[in-house]
A protein has these predicted regions:
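Short glycine/proline- and aromatic-enriched beta-strand/turn motifs that initiate or cap beta-hairpins
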Residues: 23-74, 160-162
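A generic beta-sheet turn/junction motif
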Residues: 45-47, 94, 127-131, 146, ...
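Cleavable N-terminal export/targeting peptides
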Residues: 1-30
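Gram-negative (and chloroplast) outer-membrane scaffold detector with strong preference
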Residues: 55-139
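Short glycine/serine/threonine-biased micro-segments
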Residues: 36, 40, 99-101, 122, ...
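Outer-membrane beta-barrel "beta-signal"
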Residues: 149-162
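Flexible, glycine/proline-enriched loop segments at strand-loop-helix junctions
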Residues: 141-143
Length: 162
């Protein structure tokens, strides 16, 4: 099994165990689903590129959120032009200020003028209580695609719509 596949399988297994444990502790009740939207900007340190994008979050359970997002990359050295993500995230701790997740990545690769698929792993910190309407965050993100895995630091905020 290739190294990247082992990392992905291990990460997904850990997230599944955490989600199952949290879901069983919550019982059948729980808060209603919440919807968030936000903007974010980041820096790809390997390819020396800046990014600007947005994300939407749909919290299905108390600590699990589906989080699609998209980013556009600026710079001539980066092979990436844009990236769409289909991610899920799990929050930790009593204040839900730490989160981790992963998912699929769809990346427009410039030299090939083609869209490649890969996967993401990330973890981050939210700087406001879970019940806050606006939540600033910082995220550490890796995307494996086209035999590369650049590290990105992403900062932004999410605003609760409902």
């Amino acid at each position: 099994m290739p190294r990247h596949s082992r990392i992905l399988a291990t990460g997904l297994a850990l997230l599944s165990l955490i989600f199952i444990r949290n879901a069983s502790a919550q019982g059948r009740g729980g808060p209603p689903a919440t919807l968030t939207a936000g903007v974010r900007g980041g820096r790809d340190f390997e390819n020396h590129a800046w990014s600007l994008g947005g994300q939407v979050g749909l919290r299905l359970r108390d600590r699990f959120e589906i989080r699609p997002s998209g980013d556009y990359f600026f710079g001539d050295e980066t092979p990436f032009r844009w990236q769409l993500n289909a991610d899920g995230a799990v929050t930790f701790g009593p204040s839900r200020s730490i989160y981790a997740g992963g998912g699929a990545a769809f990346v427009k690769v410039r030299p090939l003028d083609d869209v490649k698929t890969g996967y993401n792993l990330f973890f981050g910190l939210s700087f406001a209580p879970a019940q806050s309407r606006s939540r600033p965050f910082a995220e550490f993100r890796w995307t494996w695609v086209n035999d590369t895995s650049p590290f990105r630091l992403v900062v932004g905020f999410s605003y609760r719509l409902r």
